[in-house]
Amino acid sequence: MTRLVLIDGNSLLHRAYHALPKTLTTSEGQVVNAVYGFTRMLLKVIKDLKPQYLAVAFDMKGPTFRHLEYEKYKEKRPEMDTELAAQLPVVKELLESFEIPVYEIQGFEGEDVIAALIAQSAKRKVQSQVQSSKLGGLETVVVTGDRDVLQLVDERTKVYAPLKGLSNPIMYDAAEVQKRYGLTPEQIVDYKALRGDPSDNIPGVPGVGEKTAVELLQKYGTLEEVFNHLDELPERQQKLLREYRKQAELSQKLATITTNAPVELDLDKCRVGDFRSKKAIEALKKLEFKSLVRELEGGEGLRSERPKQEEQEDAGQLELLEI
């Protein structure tokens, strides 16, 4: 099946920034640890997943529609480090040199943009580069470290997520989601409605922990059915769920990734090309990513070896990025 890979740019860049030391700089002192880690992971994704189409989605600065629903949404999340923020435009310039399209829309998170692109891709018929037959829709793989996106998993959509830093990625289909979390992809939203999500300041139901939320959904299936069977629950759970029902319903709304972001999937622009273009090589040279330049200029594809000098500079951290 023809494959479209959609990368959650903010998630990957954030992970790269925290996985690699800030001592990874250019000769002029420009910190490029996040850019380097992002680029390494990008090339690993291309090597491992072999997509025919590829795009990257980013958040945009400013409030989203979720902030309009709940002013305290993500209230406790600290501002992006200035050294990370400075690398965001650098990554976008690098993606442009690779001719990889970037999608971002004010008022929506990157996850919403990805969901909208997935919804559109499901309706497309594309010519397979491997087969001559027409295929209805695309297989889509979302690359992200954010487990919220697991709610998008279905028969045509998978999530490729690193377990630690940027290493040991797992390919989530519906069976893998069930195996690891005891829930179906469709239940992820209702789980967050009950449990909440401290990282996004989604309140959930106070007193309902991870174990209880999973048990309730395993027994009743959905948040609505949990409320339909309150009389069957222990008195304490009944009291909490009755008292915080509106808060749970708000949390459900906040946790739901929407598919209505106003973006348009352009498969022609997303088609994966040759990254050994002069423009791409020059962009890597400017950032002084010598090993990547050697790999691409040598025409040997995405090699697993890396220069010893760079390995030493990375202070033992780049084993997370070996490809």
Write out the residue ranges for each language-model feature.
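Conserved RecA-like ASCE P-loop NTPase motor core of nucleic-acid helicases/translocases
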Residues: 140-146, 288
